[in-house]
Amino acid sequence: MAKEFSRTRRIGQQLQQELAVVLQRDMKDPRIGFVTVNDVDVSRDLSYAKVFVTFFEEDKDVVQEKLNALIAAAPYIRTLVAGRMKLRVMPEIRFVYDSSLVEGMRMSNLVSQVINSDKAKQQQFGSVDDDVIENDIEESDDTEGKV
């Protein structure tokens, strides 16, 4: 039976916190810029850590350049984090761009556009009266009882 808070999950959470601090304070590479560590998935044997990151930029080319800079700096980042954590073996860090935040924002914008479009159509053509809706409901109830 799996524990609620497994060791790999606790190490992943600590690694996420330490990576955020290292990337914010210790990394001076201007190519990386502002980066957010969303999640860290550590393998069961603690040999690999998949780090999900997002950037302030939305342009795909700029995001890819920043991700490549992080991948190139991964060994250096690993040594900085290893000095801050008490582990016998520090996991190999693999950076992965997390597009879920961008996709969530895109979906939210689409929903907002549809809502605004519906409101505009409602104002343009007028709203349906509540009496008409109630009459339709009553008529459908009457026909269901007669069947």
UniProtKB/Swiss-Prot annotation:
SUPFAM superfamilies: Ribosome-binding factor A, RbfA (SSF89919). One of its GO terms (biological process) is ribosome biogenesis. Residues 128-147 have a biased composition (Acidic residues). GO terms for molecular function: ribosomal small subunit binding. Residues 122-147 are annotated as: Disordered. It holds the Pfam family RBFA. Its main location: cytoplasm. GO terms for cellular component: cytosol. Monomer. Binds 30S ribosomal subunits, but not 50S ribosomal subunits or 70S ribosomes. One of several proteins that assist in the late maturation steps of the functional core of the 30S ribosomal subunit. Associates with free 30S ribosomal subunits (but not with 30S subunits that are part of 70S ribosomes or polysomes). Required for efficient processing of 16S rRNA. May interact with the 5'-terminal helix region of 16S rRNA. This is Ribosome-binding factor A. It comes from Shewanella oneidensis (strain ATCC 700550 / JCM 31522 / CIP 106686 / LMG 19005 / NCIMB 14063 / MR-1). The gene is rbfA.
